[in-house]
Amino acid sequence: MQDPLLPPDDHRALAGRLDLCHFQDEAPGMAFWHPRGWTLYRLLEAAARAHVLAGGYREVSTPQLLRRAIWERSGHWGAFAGAMFAVGDGPDEAALKPVSCPGHIQIVKRLAPSWRDLPLRIAEFGRVHRDEPGGTLHGLLRLRQFTQDDGHIFCTDDQIADEVARFCRELPAFYARFGFTDVSVALSLRPEQRLGDDAAWDRAERALGDVVAELGVPVDVQPGAGAIYGPKLEFALRDRRGRAWQCGTIQLDFAMPERFDVRYVDAAGERRHVVMLHRALFGSIERFLGVLLEHHGAALPAWLAPEQVAIVPVAARHRPYAERVRGELVGLRVRIDDGDDTLARRVAIAHHDGVPLVAIVGDRDVAGESVAIRARDAQVTLPLVEAITDLRNRCTALADRGAERGE
């Protein structure tokens, strides 16, 4: 249900209107996902998963709860204890993870890689928790529970430039699939509170700066905005109203591999510390979904629409033909609306619900085996076979490009 106090193009109002999710006081900063919203969420997750698996990442899963000792060693306890949900006390004190990187480090230490195994790329769609102040919570854009498309690259010094450049080259094409073509980049440098010495920070900042300079990417340098363990490149998407939303990031980290003593065996048999790159495409799935709604409103790209096609029979006698059309569209997300409302009202409801394609079938369509397809901006009547092909093409355009690299 849409909140009447919100502007109609606010993502929170759209989430209610489109029946995607809701929030309530008993779970502040956490979304209750409805079937339509969960469909959209899973589509975003699947797109990111296809992209990273095609890029040589291996997917893992790490525990939600880790003992305090892990967070002290990573530096998160000292820097962010107030924003972590802690449970227990004494030696059993633990915290829900606000990030997945310490868990990934535990896996890599067990894998004990050699130089032949590097770069080692690990990905996780990890649910994380952060105790954000109540006044800062803002729909899907600022939550206490959310899912990071978290990835880490463990590599050698010599591999840093190639890995960062590869990420930077591929990201614009990934965002373009969702309708974002204006992407800006910021280089965030050492904050006042940080891990590691100045020499390591000099080296890390120089490495990221050299990569973007080599690629010819203009950057906005932001002193003091880096992560506690290293500098980062941040990617902001500009929406249809000119607002910038920070989403993707890649961060260079020499500190955490040293704190956890994460090493690889080089070609000479020596054990050396790995370099760790933290990276994300969306930042969080929930936040990116909110940004999508702020950008597209209810008119999401057809491949992302929770319901892609609404088949509207003119009268009850056209229901069997509508069922036949739906049977030809197996694999798409299709509904039939043969309710008691007028034809015009049912078509309007479909568009109000964000359904991008409406297939209208009446006497002439049944007799001539055709379908009238009404999109958001035009209408065309096609023979049944052509109509099915047209609908499939519209609904799958861009949907299967997740495995393509460097588009």
Task: Label every model-predicted segment.
Residues M1-E407:
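NTP/phosphate- and nucleic-acid-binding module
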